Amino acid sequence: MEYKSSPKRPYLLRAYYDWLVDNSFTPYLVVDATYLGVNVPVEYVKDGQIVLNLSASATGNLQLTNDFIQFNARFKGVSRELYIPMGAALAIYARENGDGVMFEPEEIYDELNIEPDTEQPTGFYEAVDKPKKREEKKKTKSVSHLRIVD
């Protein structure tokens, strides 16, 4: 019987994050911006990746869960809410000396990065604020059944 363990990535990410912060390093996160569900400022994406500063001074409401990383950050003075599924986290390292870790591929994250067969909103924002427009029925002119009587 094969034992299925939970993914290592969230635990390693949190451990390295804590170690970097405890040693006064600036934690940088490398993100696969093409991964399904990623919400980052696309104007800063380069070669499908973005590097994000996770320091306390650069982020607000930072959450490092087993499934995702979420926080607020400012880009050119504009506040943005970022959402990174754990499968999109590629590496975490210190800005000052590059010390850190690249995460090994894990099968579960490959499975989660597959587009669903049916089109569904990816989040509450899309479902509520950007509803799909209903296709309007095209009105066709029909010949009137009325006629002019003299």
From Swiss-Prot:
The segment annotated Disordered runs over 114-150
Q: Which GO terms describe its cellular component?
A: cytosol; ribosome
Lineage: superkingdom: Bacteria
Renumbered to this chain, the Basic and acidic residues biased-composition regions fall at 127-138
Q: Which GO terms describe its biological process?
A: positive regulation of protein catabolic process
Cross-referenced InterPro entries? SspB, SspB-like_sf
What Pfam families does the entry give?
SspB
Q: What does this protein do?
A: Enhances recognition of ssrA-tagged proteins by the ClpX-ClpP protease; the ssrA degradation tag (AANDENYALAA) is added trans-translationally to proteins that are stalled on the ribosome, freeing the ribosome and targeting stalled peptides for degradation. SspB activates the ATPase activity of ClpX. Seems to act in concert with SspA in the regulation of several proteins during exponential and stationary-phase growth. Also stimulates degradation of the N-terminus of RseA (residues 1-108, alone or in complex with sigma-E) by ClpX-ClpP in a non-ssrA-mediated fashion.
- SUBUNIT field: Homodimer.
Family listed = Belongs to the SspB family.
User: What is the designated name of this protein?
Assistant: Stringent starvation protein B homolog
Q: What is the lineage of its organism?
A: Bacteria, Pseudomonadati, Pseudomonadota, Gammaproteobacteria, Pasteurellales
- The gene name on file is sspB
